[in-house]
Amino acid sequence: AAAMLNDGKVDPSDKVYCPGYYEAGNRRFGCWEKKGHKYMDWLSGIANSCDVYFYRMGLRAGGEAIEKYEKKFGLGQRTRIGLPGERRGHVFGPENRKTETKRQGSWHDGDTCNLAIGQGELP
């Protein structure tokens, strides 16, 4: 969400229509609300946890921007609070796919859709 607003690619008043799914490439990504939420802006997208809103806004922001904010928020890093056995986590994104994962390759819109709702590949 921060990546979408802070980089200026999304305005909170922008409306997205949610029919209950979003198609990216040859894949259909569903919203938890099968009937759809209809028109959603930023606040209603968050309040209703509308997957389609975040798929579309995530694609507008781009996978690189979302990954940048994952790192800014410290995701994938140790907490530094002394947890025994703690290891760093995995940051999912286009740059990480190029450098750190076994599944190196192209980044697709479907990957950004997953990333925009906090889902995606694990190493």
Task: Describe these PLM feature segments.
Residues 2-123:
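Beta-lactam-recognizing serine transpeptidase/beta-lactamase-like catalytic domain environment
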